[in-house]
């Protein structure tokens, strides 16, 4: 009987959670339809990621995407899955994917009111060595009265109504940020549902970990070089920060959310506009971190305030615990004033 007593009979799934939030806001239920469909794609991708070796899904598919990355077989599969489930949710009108050069306009008979920007498989260069990868998404409402077009996706991150990511790691986790905050759901493979495990997640005010690719150190600007040196050799003789960098944005940002600290993918001499894409990488992650009480900046401005001009626009990003990001900004402003 003890085993039965330990089984939760009042579980909160993603569907239940979003329905409850929609009921409070007197919503139409379209967001529930959209997120339900997205969860279906995430479950399918999670299974595909775990079966990749057996199903011969590793390796290059023979093409490059619009941003020049080599496309893996799993990328192609994941993109097709997300596009198809979002179209069939009857809740979307415009889809922007890292893998497609142009925005996808949903057929008139399937259209809803939401615009979704997504990276179907972020960190895919890590697939072959089994490092954690993920799916990132940002959801906007269509605000123009015109027929759906690519322009509907060119909204600042402040307009997001929901954003988040799925992390395919030792378990599959869905992190969902909405107006009410950030909540984490774990995929229970036994019942095939995402179960709420962490409600109203908040990032630490200050962490003890910094995360960036120091292989580009020779191209860092002086402000970044000074900041990293202060983390390694604190001027007040406090404990130095630990360095952690996976190279998969979902994994690095999730660790930053859970443990605190700072994640940086700044501009440098080789990439003056940064390397990460604004609509489906920077904005969703910035939204999650801000809703958790953190900060996200380019150094010059808040990430969520950027008005995009291109669906594949790039942006620098520095995000994490508010005290850590504030310290970075103080050093950045000091150097900018010189």
Curated annotation (Swiss-Prot):
Binding site for Mg(2+) 1: 69, 98
Modification Phosphoserine, positions: 208
Residues where Mg(2+) 2 binds: 98, 119, 121
Entry keyword set: Acetylation, Allosteric enzyme, Carbohydrate metabolism, Gluconeogenesis, Hydrolase, Magnesium, Metal-binding, Phosphoprotein
An MF annotation (GO) of this entry: fructose 1,6-bisphosphate 1-phosphatase activity
PROSITE patterns registered for this protein in UniProt: FBPASE
GO CC list: cytoplasm; cytosol
Phosphotyrosine PTM positions: 216, 245, 265
Residues noted as binding substrate in the record, renumbered to the chain: 122-125, 213-216, 244-249, 265, 275-277
Disulfide linkage: none
Activity-regulation annotation: Subject to complex allosteric regulation. The enzyme can assume an active R-state, or an inactive T-state. Intermediate conformations may exist. AMP acts as an allosteric inhibitor. AMP binding affects the turnover of bound substrate and not the affinity for substrate. Fructose 2,6-bisphosphate acts as a competitive inhibitor. Fructose 2,6-bisphosphate and AMP have synergistic effects.
Hydrolase listed as a keyword: yes
Family in the record: Belongs to the FBPase class 1 family.
Subunit structure: Homotetramer.
Protein name, entry field: Fructose-1,6-bisphosphatase 1
Originating organism: Bos taurus
Originating gene: FBP1
């Amino acid at each position: 009987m003890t085993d039965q007593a330990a089984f939760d009979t009042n579980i909160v799934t993603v569907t239940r959670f979003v329905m409850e939030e929609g009921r409070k806001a007197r919503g139409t239920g379209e967001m529930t339809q959209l997120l339900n469909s997205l969860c279906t794609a995430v479950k399918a991708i999670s299974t595909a990621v775990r079966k990749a070796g057996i199903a011969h899904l590793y390796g290059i598919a023979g093409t490059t995407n619009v941003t020049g990355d080599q496309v893996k077989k799993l990328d192609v599969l994941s993109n097709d899955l997300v596009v198809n489930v979002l179209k069939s949710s009857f809740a979307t009108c415009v889809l922007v994917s890292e893998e497609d050069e142009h925005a996808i306009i949903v057929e008139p008979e399937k259209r809803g009111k939401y615009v979704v920007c997504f990276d179907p498989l972020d960190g895919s260069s890590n697939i072959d060595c089994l490092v954690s990868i993920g799916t990132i998404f940002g959801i906007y409402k269509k605000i123009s009265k015109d027929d759906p077009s690519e322009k509907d996706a060119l909204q600042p991150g402040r307009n997001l109504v929901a954003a988040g990511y799925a992390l395919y790691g030792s378990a599959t986790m869905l992190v969902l940020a909405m107006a009410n905050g950030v909540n984490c759901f774990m995929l229970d493979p036994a019942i095939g549902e995402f179960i709420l495990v962490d409600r109203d997640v908040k990032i630490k005010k200050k962490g003890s970990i910094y995360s960036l690719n120091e292989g580009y150190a020779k191209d860092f600007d002086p402000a970044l070089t000074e900041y990293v040196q202060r983390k390694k050799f604190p001027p007040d003789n406090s404990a130095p920060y630990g360095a952690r960098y996976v190279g998969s944005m979902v994994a690095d940002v999730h660790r930053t959310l859970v443990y605190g600290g700072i994640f940086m993918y700044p501009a440098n001499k080789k990439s003056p506009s940064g390397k990460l894409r604004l609509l489906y990488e920077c904005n969703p992650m910035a939204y999650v971190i801000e809703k958790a009480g953190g900060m996200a900046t380019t150094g010059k401005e808040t990430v969520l305030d950027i008005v995009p001009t291109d669906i594949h626009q790039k942006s620098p990003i520095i995000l994490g615990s508010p005290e850590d990001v504030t310290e970075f900004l103080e050093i950045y402003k000091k150097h900018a004033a010189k």
